[in-house]
Amino acid sequence: MDDRIEGQASADPGSAPVSVHFVNNVLAAAASLIDVEPDSARDVLADLGAFLSHRLRPARIVPLDQELEHVATYTRLEQARFPGRLQAELPSSRDLPSAQCTPGEVQAPVADAVNRWLGEHPGRLRLALRARLDGSSLEAQLDEPDDPSVAGERVRIVLTPATIAGGLA
């Protein structure tokens, strides 16, 4: 059984669909908070709504700062799923170049790296995301802050040249 949502609108047919497994786990995390932390449960559900709205709208180009807000929403959802395991350092919008991308172009590879890391390492994860000044790419640095002996990982995310220029090819 495929655990991806079919019918996702996308400007790029190769873009990553949203994982049903991810959505179900976020809903389970929110459900676990309803009685003990209802405000946190509401926040998780609001973030999930924002996440799905960003990813499932028809094909379009978005500013890089909007995509990074989407990455921030994603990291909050993962923090709800894995309390205490993920620490994220994301650039502020004022530190970003004025590049553009498609929805999920940055978030999907970040999610792949985070999921791989959390699956392979039992400790906490520190994710630091940095953008190149020219807007051509970003770099995700993943490491385990509590165990410096664990080798870190770097993931380079190259933005599609057509979207950097502000349009689809």
Feature names for model-found ranges:
Residues 165-169:
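C-terminal end segment of the histidine kinase catalytic
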Residues 1-18, 22-154, 158-160:
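Two-component histidine phosphotransfer core
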